[in-house]
């Protein structure tokens, strides 16, 4: 490109006839300076011959001639003559120059042409570089940020303009709306928790107290509320174990996907005050929590035991008023006898210690089953002879087979034969017991000492018994909100020998503050009250729900008989099955079991619905039927079937498909021909298998075919269709 541009410039220079009068030495000097000024640009060498000028002249002449020929067409013959003359003159001049060749310096002409070409190329390249720089600078000016030179001093950095960002304006209205929505969501969650707990427990005041105390606790931590520390932490705002069990059962039924972690979170939410109460106990809290048996705290217990006495402890102290000829029954969770004679005082003390240790290590259920009553040694008051070995063996056997806790029975007074069964755990409360070391020794050695056992308060008594035994004692019930001074109270720190002939009543105290015990004056007079000490009839006050279980339990025993049954009090809590009945149990020494041990396991308090009965049929694997009476008959038949398990132990009644499978397997083992075909993997038709099993037991007709096929698949028995022949 540079060479072609230089060639064009040179041609224009020759055509215009411009001549350079610069001396040869000066041209050479300029050419040398131009060489030093260049930035390394190399120009290709051009070899000019001696007759370059002649060639150029001839070329110029030919060009003029060519132009002349072109103009002839336009101007005519006159122009042709003029151009021919000019051509002739040019040729003569050229000839003259060539003839004077000796006088002309050829080096000057050659150097002149080279210098012109070199200068034009250098100038053009520098112009191109300058244009590129301008273009780049123009592009850089489009940037928002100012160009910073690396070599620039730091003092000049501050002089440049720096754009400041304008702060964004916040919408105060939007923030206010967000705060309102957040407060609404918090209040909504609190209302939901409040309503849920009210539905589950039915105690509005307790739920409100929980929410209120929890809010005070949170505000006291954050420092928002200064008077939060003045709020008293009362144990009446927490739920007991039985209340929490009831709430958890309702949650399980309503929310089937509830996990154990959710239960723990809800329990911590409800009983959040428990840890705080343990850290900072007050007088009321200490009176409701049992003293720890830790050895490290033994000295503390001995020093401060006298300052932690509650009214319930003072009223419940029996150490100074027990009579030697009176007997006090107690509950035996380990299956021992219920009642002991009071003459053996040392044995009674040991028994009370066993009960206290058992109750402190086990969680006593409030509603206990009556199945433990089946084989227990119940003998009448005043009976001092030992039970027979046969009775002892039977009791131990029945206790081992019993899977349900014993029935709680309590007996009070003399010559009345009254026993009371409790259906709620609210009556079982731990009391701070009074250490015997702070009391003076008692004269009567037959009186048992105070031990750390759970006291069972009297549930109810007939009015006649109260009139006979408690003429001088007023009715004291802390749960009813009334209190009257009684002159027969015994102090635990004084000698109680002056009141040995007195009778004391159990004072029921309520942990939650809600009265649940019956008013003794509201109990009607029972039609049977004349019980002899030597008789073997015992009176029990029991709920309707437990009465049904008691009837089923005594069916298998011949030594216990239910003779009388009377309703004492109607429903008190608004729940079905909570009515109270007074029943009389007759105990005999006949220990033989009844001939028909079958018990209908499907007996319920209410008549089950048809859908529930069909579910029971499907669970066992029996054939479906339409009528409810037929379903009940089939279930009754299933409850009387005798099965043999893998350990060759007989069981009465089937309640699942696995027990039906054991029943069918037992029938197959009794048929040698059928057993041989099964062992040899010979195919058996379904009809043949059912017929052979039916011959052994007619209960097979009630079993569904699908259940039988499932049993054959489990054992690997080859079954084929009935239409195929052998």
From Swiss-Prot:
GO cellular component, one term: Slx1-Slx4 complex
GO biological process: DNA recombination; DNA repair; DNA replication
Keyword Nucleotide-binding on entry: no
InterPro entries: Slx4_ascomycetes, Structure-sp_endonuc_su_Slx4
Keywords noted in UniProt: DNA damage, DNA recombination, DNA repair, Nucleus, Phosphoprotein
Disulfide-bonded cysteines: none
Region described as Disordered: 156-187
Alphabetized Pfam families for the sequence: Slx4
Ranges of compositional bias, category Basic residues: 161-173
Location(s), subcellular: Nucleus
Role summary: Regulatory subunit of the SLX1-SLX4 structure-specific endonuclease that resolves DNA secondary structures generated during DNA repair and recombination. Has endonuclease activity towards branched DNA substrates, introducing single-strand cuts in duplex DNA close to junctions with ss-DNA.
HAMAP family: Endonuc_su_Slx4 (MF_03110)
Family in the record: Belongs to the SLX4 family.
Assembly notes: Forms a heterodimer with SLX1.
Protein name: Structure-specific endonuclease subunit SLX4
Gene for this chain: SLX4
């Amino acid at each position: 490109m540079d060479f072609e541009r230089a060639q064009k410039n040179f041609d224009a220079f020759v055509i215009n006839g411009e001549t350079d009068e610069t001396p040869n030495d000066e041209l050479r000097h300029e050419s040398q300076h131009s060489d030093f000024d260049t930035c390394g640009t190399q120009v290709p060498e051009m070899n000019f011959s001696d007759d370059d000028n002649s060639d150029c002249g001839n070329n110029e002449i030919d060009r003029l001639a060519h132009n002349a020929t072109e103009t002839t067409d336009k101007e005519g013959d006159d122009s042709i003559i003029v151009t021919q003359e000019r051509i002739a003159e040019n040729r003569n001049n050229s000839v003259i120059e060539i003839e004077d060749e000796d006088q002309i310096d050829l080096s000057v002409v050659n150097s002149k042409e080279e210098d012109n070409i070199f200068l034009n190329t250098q100038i053009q390249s520098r112009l191109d570089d300058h244009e590129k720089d301008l273009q780049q600078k123009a592009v850089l000016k489009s940037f928002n940020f100012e160009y910073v030179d690396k070599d620039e001093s730091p003092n000049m950095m501050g002089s440049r303009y720096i754009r400041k960002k304008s702060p964004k304006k916040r919408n105060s209205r939007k923030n206010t709306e967000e705060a309102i929505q957040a407060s609404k969501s918090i209040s909504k969650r609190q209302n939901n928790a409040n309503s849920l707990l009210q539905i589950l427990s039915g105690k509005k005041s307790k739920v409100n107290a929980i929410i209120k105390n929890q809010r005070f606790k949170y505000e006291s931590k954050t420092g928002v509320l200064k008077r939060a520390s003045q709020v008293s932490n009362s144990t009446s705002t927490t739920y007991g174990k039985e209340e929490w069990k009831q709430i958890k059962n309702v949650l399980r039924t309503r929310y089937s996907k509830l996990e154990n972690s959710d239960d723990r979170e809800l329990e911590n939410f409800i009983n959040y005050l428990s840890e705080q109460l343990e850290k900072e106990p007050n007088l009321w809290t200490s009176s409701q929590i049992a003293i720890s048996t830790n050895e490290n705290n033994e000295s503390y217990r001995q020093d401060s035991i006298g300052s932690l006495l509650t009214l319930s402890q003072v009223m419940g102290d029996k150490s100074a008023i027990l009579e030697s000829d009176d007997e006090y029954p107690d509950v035996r969770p380990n299956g021992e006898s219920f009642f002991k004679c009071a003459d053996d005082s040392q044995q009674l003390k040991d028994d009370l210690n066993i009960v206290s240790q058992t109750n402190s290590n086990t969680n006593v259920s409030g509603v206990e089953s009556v199945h433990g009553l089946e084989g227990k040694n119940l003998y009448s008051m005043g009976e001092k002879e030992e039970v027979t070995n046969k009775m002892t063996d039977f009791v131990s056997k029945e206790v081992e087979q019993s899977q349900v806790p014993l029935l709680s029975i309590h007996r009070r007074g003399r010559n009345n034969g009254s026993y009371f069964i409790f259906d709620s755990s609210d009556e079982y409360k731990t009391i701070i017991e009074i250490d015997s070391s702070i009391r003076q020794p008692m004269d009567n050695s037959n009186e048992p000492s105070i031990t750390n056992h759970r006291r069972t308060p009297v549930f109810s008594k007939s009015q006649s018994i109260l009139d006979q035994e408690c003429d001088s004692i007023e009715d004291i019930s802390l749960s009813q909100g009334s209190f009257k001074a009684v002159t027969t109270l015994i102090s635990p720190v004084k000698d109680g020998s002056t009141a040995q002939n007195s009778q004391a009543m159990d004072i029921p105290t309520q942990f939650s503050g809600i009265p649940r015990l019956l008013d003794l004056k509201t109990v009607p007079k029972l039609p049977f009250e004349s019980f002899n000490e030597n008789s073997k009839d015992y009176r029990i006050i029991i709920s309707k729900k437990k009465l049904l279980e008691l009837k089923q339990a005594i069916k298998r025993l011949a030594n216990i008989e239910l003779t009388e049954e009377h309703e004492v009090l109607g429903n008190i809590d608004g729940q079905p099955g909570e009515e109270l009945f007074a029943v009389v149990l007759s105990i005999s020494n006949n220990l033989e079991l009844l001939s028909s041990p079958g018990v209908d396991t499907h007996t319920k308090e209410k008549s089950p619905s048809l859908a529930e009965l069909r579910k029971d049929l499907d669970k066992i694997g029996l054939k479906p039927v339409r009528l409810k009476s037929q379903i009940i008959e089939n279930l009754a038949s299933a409850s009387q079937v005798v099965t043999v398990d893998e350990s060759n132990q007989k069981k009465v009644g089937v309640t699942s498909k696995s027990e039906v499978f054991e029943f069918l397997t037992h029938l197959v083992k009794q048929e040698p021909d059928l057993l041989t075909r099964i062992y040899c993997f010979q195919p058996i038709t379904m009809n043949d298998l059912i017929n052979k099993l039916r011959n052994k037991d007619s209960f097979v007709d009630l079993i569904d075919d699908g259940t039988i096929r499932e049993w054959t698949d489990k054992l690997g028995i080859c079954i084929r269709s009935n239409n195929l022949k052998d």
